[in-house]
């Protein structure tokens, strides 16, 4: 495969992840499958829904969820710094999500929906340690942010041999938890495979074979091999929430559908729960296989920072560390 094809797939992964997140956010966190099905039943194009169904918060259509926003912060850091620097990344993260920002607003599950963006509790706890300079400032919980936010890092360092180390550093800033790190590393290695090699029906098993035979691996394999189960049922089985392994298992099940980019994202959003995080992952995996042409231009234009993401992604591929 030519270097230009690899670069196009890396760019597609970045854009595909963030656009999928924005497209999904209006239906994020709907955990009642009957309600979601009723609302979307007659909508052949549920993306960027003008009817905001998200029960936790209200925000502008076309913006990113907390998962996409972390993804964007990492993307911007990599471009501005011309690569990853842990201290500078921690500073950028704190400035974006910390005191005085739109994310620094009172929120309570007793008073929903919140007006404005949502900040996950483990991020709030991690911010205090980030300020102190603790490089493993994250909370010891297994959450889907770990894989949903790292696509730009994979795109820049695909094929470099440095990916595992960088993923470990990035994830532990907010999630100092082994399952979070290992899940992110597997997500990254599978995405790296698609970026470097394109579509490969055996890609999952090839990447999985390089991981130790432990419970993490068994969880991923179980989800992938239950391909006869539709994604709605898989998400119901593995859980609607943001915790791991369930959220990641729901994303893996969607990958087995072998659908195109648009169909994959729509399948994800129709399955409910913490769908924005799953869309970040599925959007990256599928876009990396099909290339940048698979992402609809009108989806990019409906993403409020879509043009900015395109420009940042173009800069990333010029700096790929292969």
Curated annotation (Swiss-Prot):
Q: Where expressed (tissue)?
A: Expressed in the rhopalia. Present in both the large and small eyes.
PANTHER family, A to Z? ADP-RIBOSYLGLYCOHYDROLASE, SELENOPROTEIN J
| Entry keywords, A to Z | Eye lens protein
Q: What is this protein called?
A: Crystallin J1B
Provenance organism: Tripedalia cystophora (Jellyfish)
Q: Which InterPro entries match?
A: ADP-ribosylglycohydrolase, Ribosyl_crysJ1, Ribosyl_crysJ1_sf
SUPFAM superfamilies noted in UniProt = ADP-ribosylglycohydrolase
Q: Which residues form the signal peptide?
A: none
The UniProt family comment states: Belongs to the ADP-ribosylglycohydrolase family. J1 crystallin subfamily.
| An MF annotation (GO) of this entry | structural constituent of eye lens
**Pfam families with a match to the protein in the record:** ADP_ribosyl_GH
What the entry lists under Gene3D superfamilies is as follows: ADP-ribosylation/Crystallin J1 (1.10.4080.10)
